[in-house]
Amino acid sequence: MSNNSAEYKELLDLKSSGKYVPPAKLKALQTKINNSSESTTEEYQVLQWEQLKRAINRQVNKCNVSNIREIVVELFKLNLQRGKGLLIRSIMKAQLTDLIFTPIYASLIAVLNSKIPEVGELILNRLLLQFRKNYIKNKKNCISSAIFIVHLINQRVCSEILILQILQLLLENPTNDSIEICVEIMNQVGKYLQENSVAANNMIFNRLRSILHENEDINDRSQFLIENLFKTRKNGYSEYPIIRKELDLVDLDDQETHLLELDAKVKSNDQLNIFQFDEQYDENEKLYDNVRKDILGDSDEEDDESEAEESEEDNKEILEIKDMTESNLLNYQKTVYLTVMSSMSSDEAVHKLIKLNFKKSNEEKYKNNEILVDMIIKCCSQEKTYSKYYGVIGEKLCSMNKSWHTIFIDTFKKYYSTIHQFETNSLRNIGKFFGHLFASDKLAIERSWNVIRLTEEETNSASRIFIKFIFQEMIEEIGIKGLQERLDDDLIRQETNGLFPRQGVTYRNAEDIRFSINFFTAIGLGILTEEMRDVLKNLPPEERGRSRSVSGSSRSGSSSYSRSRSYSRSSGSYSRSRSRSRSRSRSRSRTGSRGRTMSRDRSKSFSRSRSTSRSRGESFSRSPSRLPTGSKRFKPN
């Protein structure tokens, strides 16, 4: 494995352990490996494996009722033959975290199983092994595996024989826990069994009835659960449909049903979860490309046909939607505002906001997303105090894809250039909003702060206050050490030299580095200025002197300057004298001369004189001096 691959693996290990790794550095290393490696090398395949794993996890975590169709398409674009182990592990982990999403993941598996049956077979094997393991250890969380199997049966991915055997096992020696699991299973699968396996369904209810009347070991809660199950059955399972309408995505003819029994000898194939070098990598990729074309090609043609029919029928309506008038803009802004204000949580708000642009073209989506981000920031600025509710909304939107990330970067630059238009309270809220995005590492610092030049000429009081609130929010969330680590990253250092002048500093911009040091010291972040202080301290002496003289000359008033020279020669001797006179509007005057020996005298009238004597003499005087005959005096304009 090369140095690049080893470094990339080390960065991934650091990131997985919770330590901060600059995304730009990770991405640059990925690009370097992709450009320098071939598909037959191990480091290239490792990189592709890591990218596949992150892409699968991202799509699974984003999956919900509203976007499941889009998620299916995105997953089929990935090589599921190679990554099916990663996919199953990610789905089972997500389902175990929240059982409410089990029907959604079951619907996702049903669609994938209809095209790639190996996916359905693998998840059933792992769920069965997981149920056995937890049941033998007498763990109640075996219910999660059983519920997932139930919903896969409802989706016809698995035969109902497996769940009937599980129910028989639970009711053979009933306990309070086994009855609770059994009732929960029957609530979810009862309607399916009533329609497809009547005899087995009646047998289960007869067994529950006998337990209710004859078994004295069960508690009142278990009796109550059994009674409620009979009521649910009497009502026709109205609250428990087999498949929700929005999750019924596969036709019966297309579904692949797997036959599995409780005591079957199955393998989990855990080796599919880890990287394995593939000597025929290119050939296998081409094979899956053909599978991908077969799967997505048909759906694309159907979409094109349906879109063509809709365009012929609703051509006028489409034209009206594309005509974005001012009233439509105001209505859209109002909708965004009401959505943000009426949501109970940030997750709910993001979900509703994304649905607003669900059926828009890419160009319309981008424009509307810009308006949406602007409205979120304006809603945040109107609050009396900053609320992290808005920061979390921005964080979730910013991390969705590159388009959203670019919109947030452009919006930050726009607000930085117009921040003087806002009041102090709004300015504080906006600063803390962007500070949260930078602290959460969802917004790239190196792409956002490159427009900031912290100088007296290029900033105003509002922009400096804005910067202060950004840094204060970042320190509250990640601490001063975390902030220093990010600012010390090489990529960030290059792009933030206007904010922290540390590279290429000369006497000409020494005042800028002093201004930056004074600013961060004044807001209590002097620790960030240590390197800048060293840079300023190590400037060459002549450069520091010139910088002071330049600044001093800019404060001077009007001046006059005269010079005269006289030469006289005698035998074997030569003498030259020069006199200068300069008058200023200031009340203080100086006279001086340069030579090898010097004497200084100060008078009470605040005048200085220096004199020297040598073969060549010079004298300088602030007051007008006598000029040799024939010389002219320069008069100030």
Curated annotation (Swiss-Prot):
The gene is CWC22. Keywords: Cytoplasm, mRNA processing, mRNA splicing, Nucleus, Spliceosome. It comes from the Eukaryota. Residues 53-236 form the MIF4G domain. InterPro entries: ARM-type_fold (IPR016024), CWC22_splicing_factor (IPR050781), Initiation_fac_eIF4g_MI (IPR003891), MIF4G-like_typ-3 (IPR003890). Residues 538-637 are annotated as: Disordered. Residues 331-453 form the MI domain. It is found in: Cytoplasm; Nucleus. PANTHER family: CELL CYCLE CONTROL PROTEIN CWF22-RELATED (PTHR18034), PRE-MRNA-SPLICING FACTOR CWC22 HOMOLOG (PTHR18034:SF3). Associated with the spliceosome. This is Pre-mRNA-splicing factor CWC22. The keyword Cell wall biogenesis/degradation does not apply. Belongs to the CWC22 family. Residues 577-593 have a biased composition (Basic residues). Pfam families: MA3. One of its GO terms (cellular component) is cytoplasm. GO terms for molecular function: RNA binding. GO terms for biological process: mRNA splicing, via spliceosome. Involved in pre-mRNA splicing. Residues 548-576, 614-626 have a biased composition (Low complexity).
